[in-house]
Amino acid sequence: MMDTTKKRLPLVFTIIILFGLISMFGDIIYESARSANSQYLNLLGINAAKIGLVFGLGEFLGYFLRLVAGILSDKSGKHWIFMFIGYGMLISVPVMGLTLNWNFLFILILMERIGKALRSPAKDTILSKVSEHKVGVGIAFGIQEAVDQIGAFLGPLIFTLVFYVTGKEALNQYQVGYRVLLIPFILLMGFLYYVF
């Protein structure tokens, strides 16, 4: 029994690290957008009241729907489906670089927040089940969060680098920044499929 547990430990740690990388790429996308969205919308001439309304609604949906997603994910047992749909909705961020229509941009911002609500409870459930009897839930979440925070740091740097390379901070540069986020999105979905 002891030998079996020891053999499984490297696999469990690998899964935890992969979950961390998935979260990291998700955070690169999310934090990049978060650092740029308000200024991008401002450059499009959208007033502060509308921007505040969409961000407020997005945050509300992002937290309220976690409860709904958690209940549905537990009742159905389809945690992976919730993860794939939730992370898949991050495609909304790179797509923001393809449109100047503010109505569509608002929908994309809300989509990203809804995606976060769908994936978070499912991801936490899977991670806790994988790690519970092998390494401990606290250690697993600690490792995953540590890797995840790298993404929170790297995300805003993407737009900074785009502005630095082009030498200006204009509408086109914001669109390039959003489009570049397709790369971490593809990597994220690849890692997610691999872990699945």
Locations of the language-model features?
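Helix-loop boundary and gating motifs at the non-cytosolic
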Residues: 5-62
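Transmembrane alpha-helix termini and helix-breaking/packing motifs in multi-pass membrane transporters
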Residues: 39, 43, 154-173
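Residue-level signature of mid-helix packing/kink "hotspots" within the transmembrane helices
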Residues: 59-67, 153
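Helix-to-loop junctions at the C-terminal end of transmembrane segments
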Residues: 65-77, 163
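Structural signature of the two symmetry-related core transmembrane helices
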Residues: 81-95
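Helix-loop junctions at membrane interfaces in 12-TM secondary transporters
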Residues: 96-109
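Cytoplasmic helix-loop-helix junction between adjacent transmembrane helices
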Residues: 108-150
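Symmetry-related core transmembrane helices of the 12-TM Major Facilitator Superfamily/SLC fold
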Residues: 175-194
